[in-house]
Amino acid sequence: MASAGVDLFLGKVVGSVWSTKKTDNLTNLRFLIINPINLKKDPLTDVVIVADVLGAGVGETVICAYGHAARQAIYPQNPNEVSIEAAVVGIVDRMDVDDTMLQEIID
């Protein structure tokens, strides 16, 4: 999925996860099912469960962070106190990809 050094990815919200029993530091967190997308906006086969405090909805494209960046986004006062590995850090309003540049990347 994400390669070493890659802390952000784009994804489409495809659902949510409800959990009544979880560790205390996850109380009041909402969880979404994200399908990562590539630059051509095609969905990949993996899904990622992410924490969300921004209120993203099903069908929206979101920017997600991994690791420390995700924990910092969810609990900036003390990011080491929350046991998450991925989080929504932005909801995409629009995404413009230059087709010429995209073709260079693909080739």
Role assignments for model-derived ranges:
Residues 71-107:
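C-terminal structural segments of small proteins and small subunits
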